[in-house]
From Swiss-Prot:
Keywords: Amino-acid biosynthesis, Aromatic amino acid biosynthesis, Cytoplasm, Transferase. One of its GO terms (cellular component) is cytoplasm. Gene3D superfamilies: Enolpyruvate transferase domain. The active site is at E315 (proton acceptor). Its EC number is 2.5.1.19. Catalyzes the transfer of the enolpyruvyl moiety of phosphoenolpyruvate (PEP) to the 5-hydroxyl of shikimate-3-phosphate (S3P) to produce enolpyruvyl shikimate-3-phosphate and inorganic phosphate. This is 3-phosphoshikimate 1-carboxyvinyltransferase.
Length: 446
């Protein structure tokens, strides 16, 4: 497999970056728009166009929904219109790829159709947890063949709904996937979580917020219990925020180089973990300045390790681990609350430990996280495991460690198209970099 020579710099990085739309918001908006088609057409502005979101678009099109990107305004396909009807053709098949949102959000939608819909995905996706969602749907009266990919949902035109108990300790997406479709169920839906702490809980809060924006009545007043009242989901316009988790690798460049990086379009109020990101960057010794529509981070000349619980923001763990490995030599970082990362695109805890140690770092796995001791590292191959966040973590390490070769950098297209070009532009000192905008050689059909 080909490798990408990660650019290095011995000088502070100074750049302004615009990251594309939030994957989490884009795919939730697409699902809600598809469920709202009986009420009319919806529009989405600022949508992310990446492998994950294109898989969601294809999945909904496979269910008969019309998703169009007129691209008459130079938006590069980020302005979408959703219309049509939930009416899949006989024998419909959905490719989930490696997208957890497609795997967990679309089966409840398919259950509302009158056809049997088969789901499959990448080989690695077959190892991702899905049983709690399928068991929950069965408890609600949905007929499903199979207990993991590939599986088939036998739609009967409606879902009874009611109360269902699930263990969502493996993924908050089990809860979100059910809630998104719950208002379309005959009796509505009550989801009760019965297991250990739910990881990435802010993503459930995002789901609840967007449901309310679509006119759905949601009661989340009791811990580990969510009630969605039956009723129409409104067709409306959705404005997608920039993806703040995708901004973190660029902000990390400021942290580890002592430079200054500004991200434009940073929301003042957000359902994404904006406050947590600011707290993390501050704990790493950086100065954080937030304006009306931007965030600017100025890194310190050096910084120490941190002790942090990342349960709610596990997607940031690879970037945080990379920054921890590059802290002041001898300083120790403890990343806690992320045992669930063993069930993501890859076992991220094992992968991070293996790759940091391969390049001379010191990283040990614990029951629920990592202990990283910063030490001098050397170049070598950084394996990405077909995981977009592992690939960007390798780029962060390579910024300070010459000779790092990142395997399969193309996997970053899962959520951040054109990452290699954007990274190079940032290091070249260019400003107003537009993530997701056309570059020479970009595959426009992605």
């Amino acid at each position: 497999m080909s490798t990408w020579p990660a650019p290095s710099t011995a000088t502070p990085v100074h750049a302004t970056v615009t990251v594309p739309g939030s994957k989490s918001q884009t795919n939730r908006a697409l699902v809600l728009a598809a469920l709202a088609v009986p009420q009319g057409s919806s529009t989405i502005s600022g949508a992310l166009r990446s492998r994950d979101t294109d898989l969601m678009i294809s999945a909904l099109q496979g269910l008969g929904v019309v998703v169009e990107a007129p691209d008459t305004d130079g938006s590069d396909g980020t302005e979408l219109t959703v219309s049509g009807a939930l009416a899949p053709k006989a024998g419909a098949r959905i490719d989930c790829g490696l997208a957890g949102t497609v795997l967990r959000f679309v089966p409840p939608v398919a259950a509302l159709t009158t056809e049997t819909v088969t789901f499959d995905g990448d080989e690695q996706a077959r190892a991702r947890p899905i049983a709690p969602l399928l068991d929950g749907l069965r408890a609600l009266g949905v007929a499903i063949d199979g207990d993991g990919l590939p599986f088939s949902v036998r739609g009967q035109g409606s879902v009874r709904g009611g109360t269902v108990e699930i263990d969502a300790s493996g993924s908050s997406q089990f809860v979100s996937g059910l809630l998104l479709s719950g208002a379309a169920f005959t009796e509505g839906l009550t989801v009760v979580h019965t297991g250990g702490a739910v990881p990435s809980a802010p993503h459930i809060a995002m789901t609840v917020s967007m449901l309310r924006d679509a006119g759905v009545e949601v009661d989340d007043s009791a811990a580990d219990r969510w009630r969605v009242a039956p009723g129409p989901i409104a067709a409306r316009h959705w404005a997608v925020e920039p993806d703040l988790s995708n901004a973190v690798p660029f902000l990390a460049a400021a942290v580890i180089s002592g430079g200054t990086v500004r991200v434009t379009g940073w929301p003042t109020v957000s359902t994404q973990p904006a406050a947590t990101i600011l707290s993390l960057l501050t704990s790493l010794g950086s100065e954080v300045r937030q304006g009306n529509s931007h965030l600017e981070v100025q890194g310190a000349t050096s910084y120490d390790g941190i002790d942090v619980d990342l349960r709610d923001v596990g997607e940031l763990a690879p970037s945080v681990a990379a920054m921890a490995a590059l802290a002041s030599p001898g300083s120790v970082s403890r990343l806690r609350g992320i045992a669930h990362l063993r069930g993501h695109e890859t076992d991220r805890l094992a992968a991070l430990s293996a790759e940091l140690n391969r390049l001379g770092g010191q990283c040990e796995e614990t029951d629920d996280g990592l202990v990283i001791t910063a030490r001098q590292m050397h170049g070598g191959v950084w394996r990405s495991y077909a995981d977009h966040r592992m690939a960007t973590a390798g780029a962060i390490v390579g910024l300070r460690v010459p000779g790092v070769e990142v395997e399969d950098i193309g996997t970053t297209a899962k959520t951040l198209p054109d990452f290699p070009q954007l990274w190079a532009d940032m290091l070249a000192g260019q400003t107003d970099l537009q993530a997701g905008a056309p570059h020479a050689g970009r595959n426009q059909g992605r």
